[in-house]
């Protein structure tokens, strides 16, 4: 219920799944509430959560398996990250592409979007897993 979400929740985190779990991509109808115009809660999508957000807002996915630690370049300040090179942990099969989101960070090797924000709403996405190596991002979002 969209009204209940607005009344009961302060912020929303949509987390990822295991590499083999692609069921969320086949059940996007469960996430259509993300586009509800009156939903004014900050949302953070992590890995599969970023992919879901991108698809719900009309984006696409490309196959892009990345596993392990890599360095990504932040172009602008994003939650707790300053513009700089940062080491993050990746574990995904797909990358998300969406023109309604600004790219704040990308992987250097493939130019894959790693941190995005909706251009007009407080909706963020990260393809990497901050719960593994960059917990301060989650803490900053939750404050």
Q: In which residue ranges do the predicted regions lie?
A:
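Glycine-rich, phosphate-binding/catalytic loops in enzymes
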Residues: 28-33, 61-62, 105-107, 141-143
């Amino acid at each position: 219920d969209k009204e209940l979400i607005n009344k009961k929740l302060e912020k929303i985190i949509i987390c990822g799944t295991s590499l083999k779990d692609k069921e969320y991509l086949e059940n996007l109808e469960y996430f259509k509430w993300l586009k509800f115009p009156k939903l004014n809660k900050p949302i953070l999508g992590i890995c599969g959560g970023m992919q879901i957000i991108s698809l719900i807002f009309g984006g696409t996915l490309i196959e892009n398996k990345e596993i392990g630690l890599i360095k990504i370049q932040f172009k602008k300040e994003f939650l707790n990250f300053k513009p700089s090179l940062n080491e993050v942990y990746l574990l995904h099969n797909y990358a998300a592409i969406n023109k309604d989101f600004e790219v704040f960070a990308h992987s250097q090797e493939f130019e894959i979007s790693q941190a995005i924000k909706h251009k007009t709403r407080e909706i963020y996405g990260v393809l990497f897993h901050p719960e593994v190596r960059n917990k301060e991002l989650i803490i900053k979002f939750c404050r």
